[in-house]
Amino acid sequence: KSYKTVRDFQHGFMRDFVENILKKTATDFTYNGLENVTSKCNMFVSNHRDIALDAAILCYVFAINDMECFEVAIGSNLMQGDFVIDIAKINKMFKIARSGSAKDFYRDSILASEYMRHVINEKQQSVWIAQRNGRTKDGDDKTELGVLKMFSLSSDKAFVENFAELNITPIAISYEYEPCDFLKTMELYISSFQKYVKEPGEDLRSIIAGIMQQKGKIKISVTPSITREELEYCD
């Protein structure tokens, strides 16, 4: 079957692909909070448990409800190989730098921040980004300060106005059985006594394992956007 637009591809092939994964690897799937997605574009900030499925499942929820899918920020380490890059592009993914010199990393962070603000305010589309650099491996979901600092790099406005423009909307996803639990445990164990160095192709193996592994019950929640009043309280 051929698809003429990105929307057609996401609402056709990708919708069926994710639905098939859920049927084969999940015993139950529920979601809530779509009423919190208004006509205003959102910066979806999600906890991060699986490399591919966290964003893909939310996009699936949007597709089955005939809602426009969002652009997705992914680590530059995942953009390897022509096939992966092509799939990423057709699913509206863009890369966030994961390595490089301090100068290059800062420059790339500014560009990513400017692009995300452009997508939300000018292109009038939403963005999905993980709350941290890499998946949570110890079960402690916390938004990294570096992610919030990156958001701020694209505006000279004061804190409240800067972040209010992004319409930050937290996303929570949970899996009964942690994706890649064995691989994450091994990484945590090794990291406890030495620097962990990934093997070539390890990210791809984790993507495949996360997709194929049994997940039990899955739930995803879209929470209300952070309000101006809440931002003023934090200022």
Feature roles, as predicted:
Residues 29, 42, 70, 93-94, ...:
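A broad, low-specificity signal marking well-ordered, structured residues that form hydrophobic/aromatic
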Residues 1-42, 48-59, 63, 85, ...:
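Membrane-anchoring hydrophobic helices of lipid-metabolizing enzymes
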Residues 35, 46-50, 76-78, 97-100, ...:
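Short, flexible loop/turn elements at secondary-structure junctions
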Residues 37-40, 89-96, 125-132, 219-221:
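Glycine-rich, often proline-containing surface loops adjacent to acidic residues and nearby aromatics
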Residues 105-235:
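Non-catalytic C-terminal accessory region of glycerolipid acyltransferases
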Residues 40-42, 68-71, 125-127, 167-169:
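Generic beta-strand structural signal
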Residues 41-113:
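Long, hydrophobic, well-ordered secondary-structure blocks that form the structural core
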